[in-house]
């Protein structure tokens, strides 16, 4: 289907890919993974033709159509939503457009050309194009009323869905997508997972959504050290296999290293001894022949995210009574009653992300509720990770000084302690002297997590905690929360995160709350709950 030959990509002195040779086969779905900066998005841009490689070339099988999820959300602002989707199949759209223009000036001179175009159009199933595009849009949550709306008038999150429909439209032979689940709700992601699980052509996708990668991928394409290796299976199979293999290779490597050190010590001690010099020379040859099966150090780094508590909380964590909030007259949530118990790990969510953020800000005393009250248990202390963290970084402090602000003891204020702490969060050496203003989104989140860990709270509030994080950080964070002995209330668009951490689901709606002790999957699969949700949102 798609062949990559001797591909190299270099920016200045930085080599992203070095003589890569690989093939993407028909019918497979490849999940492209790699550490931040490994070149995942760059690779997609190269194979889709947006970026020229330094050397090498890409070969797409003749006659095959490639479709790419467009990242420019404003590119189609002058077109209607439906027309934007049709433009996903460039050949079909060009034929349709020419036909429409000729119909406006129909005469004997252009009759033959119209006939040719009609044959082409029918071969591409063009007569069903509008209805197919409309169905795709509806499945992605774009109502029929918006199908003839200009893209310029659509809000950002809806534009993303239209562009996704554009990429999927017309059954392309090769589908390339970079983070397709961004800004999608769980229901729409589930639809996309089902669509791709039944897709018969080839897909190459970059995603940080582990549940999505598990649901759709037949192969994992791992980018590391400038190379790409394909592994059969989904993300979880790759992750567990790679962890097991790494441990096995490390044990073999340790034994080989011990053998090498033993031989080197013998040479050092006895090489000057005339009587044993022949034996030393023999052992020196053994070292040169010793094949140590070393693991090449991975470019992946997993932060050490560990939440400890200063003290254990009592049974009463949080009591919320008749809490309501609105914005500009629009109700976000109303009459919320909630009693949070010790050990609860609540997945807090809503169809309107403003609702969950407002709820956290009220609990953190950053915003006032329209009505209602809340009380934290007297034995609790809370740590809060907001979805927007810009205000914490509007200074020129180094990371060492930035984190020192949140130290509780003299020991924690010590530079050696702080550097060690930052090192565990993947800020080693000179990285600890970066100023806070220049940090990337993922680095800021890791700083905020460091701050939270130093607070040693027994209740964690997390608003979209996986935003901007790479798969390694998400995995470490996920495992940390599973092991955390305190209570958690969190909002996330990461399905795996919600399913594996949460033991209670609380949904905020304009007409009250839905509150269930169950897993996230059980909640989404419960038909009675789904009917209740529709009523609560007036759908």
Predicted regions and their residues:
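ABC ATP-binding cassette signature C-motif
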Residues: 1-251, 310-539
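ABC ATPase nucleotide-binding domains
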Residues: 249-263, 267-269, 276-285, 301, ...
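Amphipathic heptad-repeat alpha-helical coiled-coil/stalk segments that mediate oligomerization
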Residues: 295-319
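Short hinge/gating elements
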Residues: 119, 268-270, 303-306, 403-405
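Proline-centered turn/helix-capping motifs that create local helix->coil transitions or kinks
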Residues: 275-279, 289-299, 375
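Short amphipathic coiled-coil heptad-repeat segments
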Residues: 134-140, 265-269, 285-290
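Extended non-transmembrane interhelical loops and adjacent amphipathic helices
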Residues: 111-114, 184, 281-292
């Amino acid at each position: 289907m798609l062949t990559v030959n001797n591909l190299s990509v270099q920016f200045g002195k930085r080599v992203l890919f070095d003589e890569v040779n690989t093939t993407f086969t028909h019918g497979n779905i490849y999940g492209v993974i790699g550490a931040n900066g490994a070149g995942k998005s760059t690779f997609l841009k190269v194979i889709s033709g947006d970026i020229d490689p330094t050397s090498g070339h890409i070969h797409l099988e003749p006659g095959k159509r490639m479709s790419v999820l467009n990242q420019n959300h404003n590119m189609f602002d002058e077109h209607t939503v439906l027309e934007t989707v049709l433009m996903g199949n460039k050949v079909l759209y060009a034929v349709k457009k020419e036909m429409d223009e000729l119909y406006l000036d129909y005469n004997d001179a252009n009759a033959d050309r119209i006939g040719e175009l009609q044959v082409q159009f029918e071969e591409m199933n063009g007569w069903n194009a509008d209805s197919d595009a409309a169905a795709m849009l509806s499945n992605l949550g774009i109502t029929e009323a918006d199908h003839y709306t200009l893209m310029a008038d659509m809000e950002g999150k809806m534009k993303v869905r239209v562009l996704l429909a554009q990429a999927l439209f017309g059954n392309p032979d090769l589908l390339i997508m970079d983070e397709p689940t961004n800004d999608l709700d769980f229901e729409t992601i589930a639809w996309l997972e089902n669509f791709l699980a039944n897709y018969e052509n080839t897909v190459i996708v970059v995603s940080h959504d582990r549940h999505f990668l598990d649901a759709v991928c037949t192969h994992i394409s791992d980018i590391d050290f400038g190379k790409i290796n394909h592994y059969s299976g989904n993300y979880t199979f790759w992750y567990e296999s790679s962890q097991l293999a790494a441990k096995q290779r490390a044990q073999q490597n340790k034994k080989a290293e011990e053998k090498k050190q033993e031989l080197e010590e013998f040479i050092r001690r006895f090489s000057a001894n005339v009587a044993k010099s022949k034996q030393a020379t023999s052992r020196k040859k053994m070292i040169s022949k010793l094949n140590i099966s070393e693991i090449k150090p991975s470019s992946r780094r997993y932060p050490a995210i560990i939440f400890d508590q200063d003290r254990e909380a009592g049974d009463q964590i949080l009591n919320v009574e008749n809490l309501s909030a609105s914005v500009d007259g629009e109700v976000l949530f109303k009459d919320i009653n909630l009693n949070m118990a010790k050990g609860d790990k609540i997945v807090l969510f809503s169809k309107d992300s403003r609702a969950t953020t407002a709820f956290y800000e009220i609990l953190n005393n950053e915003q006032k509720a329209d009505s209602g009250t809340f009380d934290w248990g007297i034995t609790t202390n809370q740590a809060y990770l907001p979805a927007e963290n810009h205000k914490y970084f509007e200074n020129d402090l180094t990371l060492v000084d930035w984190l020192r602000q949140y130290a509780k003891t003299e020991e924690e204020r010590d530079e050696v302690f702080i550097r060690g702490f930052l090192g565990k969060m993947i800020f080693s050496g000179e990285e600890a002297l970066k100023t806070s203003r220049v940090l990337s989104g993922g680095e800021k989140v890791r700083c905020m997590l460091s701050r939270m860990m130093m607070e040693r709270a027994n209740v964690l509030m997390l608003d979209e905690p996986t935003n901007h994080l790479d798969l390694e950080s998400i995995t470490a964070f996920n495992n940390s929360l599973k092991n955390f002995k305190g209570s958690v209330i969190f909002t996330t668009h990461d399905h795996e995160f919600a399913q594996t951490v949460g033991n209670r689901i609380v949904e905020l709606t304009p007409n009250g709350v839905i509150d269930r002790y169950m897993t996230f999957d059980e909640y989404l699969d419960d038909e009675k709950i789904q009917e209740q949700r529709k009523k609560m949102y007036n759908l």
